[in-house]
Amino acid sequence: SGIFWQRSCNVIEIFGFLEGKTPDHRGRILAMLLQQTDHQAEATHDYIQCLFPLDEPSRSVNGAPVLTELDIDEIKESILAQGNLAKSASWFLGFLERNQHWVTKYDHNHLRITRVIKSLRLLASDKAADEFKDKVFGYLGDDLNLIDPKARSFWNSA
């Protein structure tokens, strides 16, 4: 399968990673990333691009995977990859629900939320992306206005 991510002399095969079979550039398999503590998830900035790859370069992590049409087709057809995308989305929603530090005008987790919505829309379905987005807005409730309108706009258009 297609795209490789080269960084620090390491290579990741994104399709195999999303199927839970091959490690990322740090030797972590998908299941390991989903077992991170909230502190690890907050302090580590290169895993979200592996869990939720896109067909465009990351502005945050140089060298992050950029999906090809072949990658997208393979991921869409893979029961394992689809299941792992759903698990990853659920895990990240849990992280957001347990932590409130992102409920502020500017936070790097706002970019992560946009990436997850875009990736789910690209690789899973509009329904999965919209359900994720709706849960994020639901977590915010009365605090919705604490989030920068530009971030909310990105979420709505992702």
Where are the model-predicted features located?
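N-terminal leader regions that mediate targeting or early regulatory function
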Residues: 2-100, 117-120, 127, 135, ...
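Alpha-helical bundle/repeat cores within regulatory domains of eukaryotic proteins
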Residues: 95-158
